[in-house]
């Protein structure tokens, strides 16, 4: 597994998680 692929997947996961958190607060 390429480490850059992991980093990209992690960024997407974090961004998606942040959207859910902001949505629940709003």
From Swiss-Prot:
It comes from the Eukaryota. Its EC number is 3.2.1.52. Inhibited by AgNO(3) at a concentration of 0.1 mM. Strongly inhibited by CdCl(2), ZnCl(2) and FeCl(3) and moderately by CoCl(2), CuSO(4) and NiCl(2) at 10 mM concentration. CaCl(2), MgCl(2), MnSO(4) and KI also have a slight inhibitory effect of 20%-25% at 10 mM concentration. Activated to a small extent by MgCl(2) at 0.1 mM concentration but inhibited with increasing concentration. Not affected by carbohydrates such as fucose, galactose and glucose but displays a slight decrease in activity up to 25% with lactose, alpha-mannose and N-acetyl-galactosamine (GalNAc). It catalyses: Hydrolysis of terminal non-reducing N-acetyl-D-hexosamine residues in N-acetyl-beta-D-hexosaminides. Disulfide bonds: none annotated. Glycosylated. Keywords: Glycoprotein, Glycosidase, Hydrolase. One of its GO terms (molecular function) is beta-N-acetylhexosaminidase activity. Optimum temperature is 50 degrees Celsius toward pNP-GlcNAc and 60 degrees Celsius toward pNP-GalNAc. Displays activity higher than 50% between 35-70 degrees Celsius. Stable under 30 degrees Celsius. Optimum pH is 5.0 with pNP-GlcNAc and 4.0 with pNP-GalNAc. Half maximal activity observed at pH 3.0 and 6.5 with pNP-GlcNAc and at pH 2.5 and 5.5 with pNP-GalNAc. Retains over 90% of its activity between pH 6.5-8.0 with pNP-GlcNAc, and between pH 6.0-7.5 with pNP-GalNAc. Detected in dry seeds and cotyledons. Has hexosaminidase activity. Active with both p-nitrophenyl-beta-D-N-acetylglucosamine (pNP-GlcNAc) and p-nitrophenyl-beta-D-N-acetylgalactosamine (pNP-GalNAc). Not active toward p-nitrophenyl-beta-D-N,N'-diacetylchitobiose (pNP-(GlcNAc)2) or p-nitrophenyl-beta-D-N,N',N''-triacetylchitobiose (pNP-(GlcNAc)3). Removes terminal GlcNAc and may be involved in storage protein degradation. This is Beta-hexosaminidase. It comes from Lupinus albus (White lupine). The lineage of its organism: Eukaryota, Viridiplantae, Streptophyta, Embryophyta, Tracheophyta.
